[in-house]
A protein has these predicted regions:
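Cytosolic C-terminal regulatory domains/tails of membrane transporters and channels
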Residues: 428-548
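Transmembrane helical cores of multi-pass secondary ion antiporters/exchangers
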Residues: 1-434, 516-536, 540-548
């Protein structure tokens, strides 16, 4: 029962944290609020203790979030920015592990070289979810955010694989060689991507088979979709591949496979609402768990530091600042180098970095905040070596990693709004143009389809529909579509007409809903009739609201 009540309390806290941030007279990013509430609940006064199992955390929370990110990631843009993304997610991770690893070994007494590499490895993954939480959706220009999100999807795997190598060397179960590490990394990465693709493809085939046999019940399909992401992760991990990349690949494959495009309307609507709820809860749980671990990490690390003659307690806090500053310097230097290389050697097909200003490079550097993967990775470091001795400097690694996570979030909260203040984003203007173009293009196609249907119905003797009625209905529908096409020339008027029509329809639907409840209250209709008609109205209203 204790676990059950703990889950209920955490879910309640996640739900209320959003309300708290809106009620406060000053603005606090939601992730920081959830971390603060978690730390407060775990303080000895309240005593909510949650045992953090890194392996369970990686299986339970990370696959759904990465699957959802992969699902939402536009594949075309991801491929177009492939050089930039892999330059950050692979090459920069290697540079970070080597460079920051030697720095940690040099500035932090008591941390041997291999554990220093392990700490640098867990500090290399960035967290796009935390970034969106501290700056808000759409605040960072799309050209930057798209690359940062792609980087975050990929560098989780590269960082954890680097950690695995470092821990294996420290445990004495592996002799590190560059060639061996490269082959192992390629095997883990490519195998994970293939595993995610195959599992997702099999899911798509099975959904088509079930639909053919009448098994297109939305609830069943959503549950199977939810199980898909765990299946891709667990199968890949069982084989020895990257489960993280498998979850990402499965999410991206779903968008390209056409499964959602051909799914029933009810399934698409329910899937979107279900995933929105799960993302909110899982994201909140991640930051809440981070906060719940902080008091224990702080107290145990300080006690261990006091007992360690080689460590000055106050220097641990200084080391956090120095390590974070070094991470930002390496990141900025790498971005600046890629910009120069693009301008010098890739003039025919330059990378996106080639046109970035120094301010945009700074934004991308500070935006590389650390989050859940870093904490889970560092806590997964074993307590003991095979010979029974304690893993070298484990408490220091955990303390420094947790400190860098928090410090990166605080710096992001303060610095990013300042850096973004003078950045004029034209993303919304471009999006409005694309929307108008798409609406007009789809209206043209729709008009042709209606005209063909009118001709088919008029020639169908079985339907036996009056030609005048056919013409009247088709003309009314085509008239609405014509206004959308004409909107290319008079955009504001067209958008105003669509907005007014939507508002009128919503008002009508809501009044109909109220009347249905009245009819049920006066016992003029049964509860079954009420539920059926309410379901129809909900679908229509969802379509109108989705179109806003």
């Amino acid at each position: 029962m204790e676990i059950f009540f703990t889950i209920l309390i955490m879910t309640l806290v996640v739900s209320l944290s959003g309300v708290v941030t809106r009620v406060l007279p000053f603005q606090v990013p939601l992730p920081l609020m959830q971390i603060a509430i978690g730390a407060l609940l775990a303080w000895p006064t309240f005593g909510l203790h949650v045992e953090f199992d890194p392996e369970l955390f990686l299986v339970l929370f990370i696959p759904p979030l990465l699957f959802a990110d992969g699902w939402k990631t536009p594949t075309r843009e991801f491929i177009e920015h492939g050089r930039e993304i892999f330059g950050l997610a692979l090459a920069l991770v290697v540079v970070t592990v080597v460079g920051i690893g030697f720095l940690i070994y040099w500035i932090v007494p008591g941390i041997p070289l291999v554990p220093a590499f392990a700490l640098a490895a867990v500090l290399s993954p960035t967290d796009a979810v935390a970034l969106s939480g501290i700056v808000g959706e759409g605040r960072i220009p799309k050209k930057i955010m798209g690359i940062l999100q792609g980087e975050a999807l990929m560098n989780d795997a590269s960082g954890l694989v680097s950690l695995k190598f470092a821990v294996a060397v420290a445990m004495g179960t592996m002799v590190f060689t560059i060639g061996g590490a490269t082959v192992e990394f390629l095997k883990v990465a490519i195998g994970g991507i293939l595993a995610g693709f195959v599992v997702s493809w099999l899911y798509g085939r099975s959904m088509r088979f079930l639909s053919r046999w009448g098994g297109d019940e939305p609830a069943t399909q959503i549950v199977l979709l939810f199980l898909l992401l765990f299946a891709s992760y667990l199968i890949a991990e069982h084989i020895g591949f990257s489960g993280i990349l498998a979850a990402v690949a499965a999410g991206m494959t779903i968008t390209r496979s056409g499964v959602m495009r051909t799914a029933p309307l009810a399934m698409r609507l329910r899937a979107n609402s279900t995933w929105a709820m799960l993302e909110f809860v899982f994201n909140g749980m991640v930051f809440l768990l981070l906060g719940l671990q902080l008091p224990d990490i702080l107290s145990s690390s300080l006690v261990a530091a006091e007992a360690d003659p080689n460590v000055e307690t106050w220097m641990l806090f200084t080391d956090i600042v120095l390590i974070y500053a070094a991470l930002m310097l390496v990141r900025f230097g790498w971005l600046w180098t890629m910009r120069k290389l693009s301008q010098r050697f890739l003039k025919k097909k330059p990378m996106e970095f080639g046109s970035w200003t120094t301010r945009e490079l700074l934004i991308s550097s500070v935006a590389g905040v650390r989050g859940a993967i870093t904490l889970a990775g560092v806590l997964s470091i074993p307590l003991l070596l095979p010979d029974g001795n304690v893993f070298p400097a484990r408490y220091e690694l955990i303390f420094l990693a947790a400190g860098v996570i928090l410090f990166s979030l605080f710096v992001g909260v303060i610095a990013l709004p300042i850096l973004l203040r003078r950045i004029e984003s034209t993303d919304h203007v471009q999006q409005r143009k694309e929307e108008r173009l798409a609406r007009a293009a789809t209206a043209d196609v729709a008009i042709v389809a209606i005209q063909k249907m009118e001709e088919r119905l008029a020639a169908d003797t079985k339907e036996n529909i009056d030609n005048q009625l056919l013409t009247e209905v088709s003309s009314r529908v085509i008239g609405n579509l014509r206004r959308r096409v004409d909107g290319r020339n008079d955009v504001e008027t067209s958008m105003l007409e669509e907005s007014l029509e939507r508002r009128f329809r919503l008002a009508a639907l809501r009044s109909e809903r109220g009347e249905l409840y009245h009819l049920r209250a006066t016992r003029q209709i049964s509860n079954e009739t009420l539920q059926k008609l309410l379901h129809d109205l909900d679908l229509l209203e969802a379509l109108l609201i989705e179109d806003q």
